[in-house]
Amino acid sequence: GFGYDLHPRLPQSAEGADENWSWAYMFDRMYRGDMEGLFAFGMNPVSNGPHSKKVVSALSKLKWLVVAENFEQETAAFWRDDIQALVDQTPADVATEVFMLPAANFAEKDGAFVNSARWIQWKWKAVDPPGEARPDQEIIARIFLAVRELYAREGGVHPAPVAALDWWYSNPASPSLDEAAKEINGWATE
C-alpha cells in the first residue's frame, strides 16, 4: 500500500548499506559528474558550503540547476566571471543551464523553519509576496502538475510514480501546509 513500491531506492554500497546522500556527499557526486541536476530551495551552497571552490566546480558539471530564491544569490549566479574566477574558469566553460524561480522570502510565507542549532519553529506570513514570487510548496506543486500533465500527454521513463500520485489537496496548484501536515502525520480514514 501507500505506493512505497513506486519510490526510488537509494543505491547500496558494496557492504549493502544505503549510500550517503547528505550535503557533502551529494556535492561530491556532482563534482565527479554523477548527477545531472539540482533543485536548490532555501539554500545557497556556493556561499554556505564547506568548500566553495569545489561547490562551484560541482555546479559547473550539472546539466541543469533550478534555484528558487527571492533574489539572485551566489548559487544562481555561479556561472558569472567573478565566481568562476575562483576555479580558474570562465562562463564559456560552464554548460549548466540555470533556471531562477521567484520565491517568497521568510516573511512572505507560512511554514516551519529549522536551523543548525536544531530549533524548529512555525510562523505565519506577514505580507503577500510581490510580483510572481510564490511560496515553495506552490512552486513544487506547479512543477509536479506540469510534469504529470507532460507524462500523461507524451509518456516517458517510469511514469507510474508520477501518474499514480494522489494529489488530493483542495487547491492542487498551491497546497495548504495544514493539509500537507495532516498527510505526513496521517489521519483516520473511517
Task: Report residues per predicted region.
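Non-catalytic alpha/beta scaffold blocks inside enzyme catalytic domains
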Residues: 1-189
